Amino acid sequence: MKTKLKVGDNVKILCGKDRGKTGEIVSIDRKNLKVVVKSCNMVKKVIKARTPQEKSKIIDKEAPVDISNVMLFSNGITSRVGIKFENKEKKRYLKKNGENV
């Protein structure tokens, strides 16, 4: 499915345990409609030792968030994203105030 969000956009989390937090999109899974937001939805992952000399580790990792639970965040405003044509180029803009992204 086509989305209007891109890697590097600042978004705000709308639902879940990290509601209200903002962060930058690290990756987008367009097939499963998930996004990974930097420093949001952190989970603990256990890395098993491969050899007897190594120790197991527990690391914090960002888990994906459903794309419907995030919204573009710019200048303190959350807004939906629209597309308009200027000089035969597609431009993304915030629908709430008309500002270009």
From Swiss-Prot:
Any GO BP annotation: translation
GO MF, one example: structural constituent of ribosome
Quaternary context: Part of the 50S ribosomal subunit.
Name of the protein this chain belongs to: Large ribosomal subunit protein uL24
RNA-binding in keyword set: yes
Gene name per UniProt: rplX
HAMAP family the record matches: Ribosomal_uL24_B (MF_01326_B)
Transmembrane in keyword set: no
Alphabetized UniProt keyword annotations: Ribonucleoprotein, Ribosomal protein, RNA-binding, rRNA-binding
